[in-house]
Amino acid sequence: TEIHACKMTKDGYHTWQYMEEDLDILKDPSVKAAFIVNPSNPPSYGLTDGLMKRIVDIVRNDNPNLMIITDDVYATYIPHFRSVMAELPENTLCVYSFSKYFGATGWRLAVIALHEKNVFDRMIANLPRKRKSELTKRYGSLSMQVENMKFIDRMVADSRQVALNHTAGLSLPQQMQMSLFASFSLLDKENTYRHAMLNLIHSRLKALWDNTGFILPDDPLRAGYYSEIDMLVWAKKFYGDDFVHYLKSTYNPLNVVFRLATETL
């Protein structure tokens, strides 16, 4: 089930946020997992405090076994960003990639963070005997006590089809790259690099929107790494419903993209 970020302002502008009541689907215990990209992709906005509080309340009061997987790759582009993992550490598996922030896309330099005490391990421990027997058979070549294996260790083994667990993980060049990137960030006490990246992203975003003639409302939750533009919203504001109908019946979104690419060669 997909939950769409369809909330809009009274003036008809997108906020690219979820409707809080739409999150109530997560209250159903039959919903086992929630996958979140925060900040989002492609709109590139972080969750509001209200949405974060709603998720926390749902987990604590309605669905305590909800497994949350959050991709926080764009987090560094929002000052004072706070991850779902900070609010619900035991329920959350956090994925973070170095690639966007350090311009190393393609290398797949990423880490997975999981709290030592987590719902994933708890759910495995509470599986029925038949399922546990299946898992013992699957991971039996790795441990004499499969029942004590952590979820994250099982996941690493699964990445190499279990049998090749001894080759799991990134190769040395990728490990060294991540070590250097992380060390660089820790040593940059003044966040000089981060400020430079924020200025670069914001200048690119401004250049895009200035040339569209559209208005980009201020929003402290905007990462700005990507931008999603609803052409029909602006068509309606500038030219009315008849023009919107003409656009929808005459063109498709790719026409705009290809024309933009052609005219900027």
Give the predicted meaning of each segment.
Residues 1-265:
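PLP-dependent class I/II
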